[in-house]
Amino acid sequence: MKFSDNLKAFLDMIAYSEIGTELLKVSDNGYDVIVGSTPQNPILFTNYSEHPRKYQAAQNSDAAGRYQFMGRYWIPYKRQLSLPDFGHESQDIWAVQLIRECRALDLIEKGKFDAAVTACKSRWASLPGAGYGQHENKIEPLRQAYINAGGVVA
């Protein structure tokens, strides 16, 4: 699937926010990361046929992949989007669907970065203002990650 430069940069920003630069480097660009991973102790999966659903008690989560998807949502989105597997393209398509549900695609295309992040905060706990009680990143480094990935801010 082909994505605009702004959308690709926004996806990269989400991965940066959820996983971090160092963990992206020691993994398959985040696509194989299980929640609870650190750059020093990456917890990775190798079978992309399905969401791995590896529960990590310390995080009370089974989030996995580049965009840290929860396992309980895998089957509904797999069916809705006709995803063949949990591979790179499927994860990207699923993330774009979440962005679409947040009504942020147009904001991203228009370069309204801050508004797009705010619109998506309900889907990703690491975004500012998400309110899940987890670490939330500040908007400035996320904006810089987006720009570094080729995104344009209006």
Functional labels for PLM-detected ranges:
Residues 1-84, 93-154:
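Cell-wall polysaccharide-cleaving catalytic domain and substrate-binding groove, primarily
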